[in-house]
Every structure is written in structure tokens, then in C-alpha cells.
């Protein structure tokens, strides 16, 4: 039994709690109203090519198409011996073969320059009440010089995004969670770690690209009061896709996307390293779509058939001209051997074909700055017999 004093105290606490709750709700409603007022234009928001980003990290890209992302750590491939490199490559091939033709996987490698002042604040040695502050100042000076002259201040991040078709969100969640578990296991076997991203983290990544230098202040509860979507919090102030030929602007940033057009039969594993050594804001996107095994087999057999016909034509020409019919153009012989090897791998080892698109997006404050970055990207490609085009 409560005394009157205790009951009065309890009622006072309830009243105080109720007032605080109402005040908080009023504040959130006012904030939501302000967010609606400050939101980017609808046209700008609609330029972001996805439908919804859910709090658990599931993204609805298009009707019936869903994706999830994981952050991956570096794999010590370059410094490994050949046997270990071969083992990593085999496990990577197994990882890719784990996707079917209803899936798409994208590997993103992001170069982002840190603000030097912020970088020094985070890493410099702070003064302490001892006799070593002069040494700390000297170390900070050396660190700053290295940051300004090298790529120490570059933040390099790597992500894997995988996409699947599904009838609804729940089915997508079930299948993508299974895929996610396989991805995490695969990268663990390669000596890496894979950390699933929630919705907020994926929005923060998009925000860093679309609004460089800004900090995303966002909570999913905000959407209840503003009536907006996640598009409103990451969209830049504007998009201009008519800025210049092959270029567009996002807010105050000028951007351009290049694609890998020509490349040798085998691309050096140093290409990505050279690209990420460029001191600039860059994003590499490698989009990988598995081709249905039956369709892939027919494609290779058809290609092989065309080359065999070409071989027969070349032999017939040689015989008419009095040459040895077994002497064929080197590239034709090599292509036939490759087609035969590929067919054998597909039949015996269940290997599959992939449709791959290699993209690089560069950003700069001005067209002149972007020109310099684009030239560095193209130069990196030329060093490996690759051509990047607009």
C-alpha cells in the first residue's frame, strides 16, 4: 500500500515522463518539417537508382531485385609466394562459381582522400606532462610531410555487393542472408574478413560519394516524422548530366566514368594496385554477372565452330597458294587452344562464364583537376596494355 506522499511522487514522475515524451515528439515533428523543407528536389532524389534502403541493410534496387553488401579487408596477395597466390586465386574462383545466373556480384574499391587536418588530429602524438614533447612535435612534423608527399592519407575501402531476384522482401532476405554467409566464409578462407553492412552504413558510403566532406546525421526514426525516404538524406543538392561531354556534376563535384574497353587475354593483378595508388577520389566497380552454364557452353561451342571454319578457310587458301596448310595465323591457333581448354574446364570442372564490366569513376573540384586524374587512370591502364574509354 502506498502512502499519499508516495502516490503523489509517483504521479509526478509519470506526468514528468509524459511531458518529456510529448516534448521529444514535438521536437521530432518540427525536425521532420525542417527536413522536408531542406530536402533536395524530387528530380535529384529520383536520379538515385534504387527504391528503398532498409535498416537491416537490405536494398530494393528495382521491383523484384534486392541486394546486400559486406566490407572486406585486404588480402595479402601481392606479398604472398606463388603457391599461396595460386591458393587464393583458386578460392576466389570458387567464390565466383558460387553465384548463379540469377545473381550479380559487384566488387567496389574506393579511394578517398582524407582531409590532412582531420588526419593529423586523429593520428598525431598529443602533448603530455613530461620531457618528450619536443620529440612528439618532431614525429608529428615527419608524419605530416609524409602525408603531404605520399598516399598515406588515402583511405582505401573494399566492398562486395551481391544481388538476387525475389518475389518479395522476405524471400529476398532469406536467400541473400544465405549468400551473405557464403561470402563471409569464402573471404575468411582467402585470409580476409567480411563484415555485413546495415542500412545506415550503406547510406553513409553513398553519402561519402554523393556529398564528399559532409557528415550524415540520420536515424531511421526520422523518416516517420518527415515522411521522406532515404533518398532525401544522401542526394546532393543537384545533378547536372549536361555539364560537358561524358561528364556530370554532383553538387560542387565534377565526375566522369570510364570503362575498360580493350585489354589483353590476361590482366595483370597490378592494374588495380596502380589505380588505387593515384592520389585522388576514385571508385572502381567490377560488375560480374554469371552466364547460365547451358547458354555459356553454347556460346563457346559457337565461337569454336566459327574459328574452325576460319581454320579450314585458311588451310584451303594455303593449299591453293602452295603453302603448308598446317601453318596457321598464330592468333587463330592460340584462340582455338583457349576455346578447347575453356570447354574442357566447363565440362570437367563445372567452371562458368561471366559477363564482366570494369568501371572507374573519378571526381574533382574542377574540370582541370578531373582532366589530370583521368589521364593518370588512362596511363595506369596503358602500363598494363589496357585502354580505358569514356
Tell me what each language-model feature is:
Residues 1-390:
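Extended, folded cores of ATP/NTP-driven motor/assembly subunits in large transport
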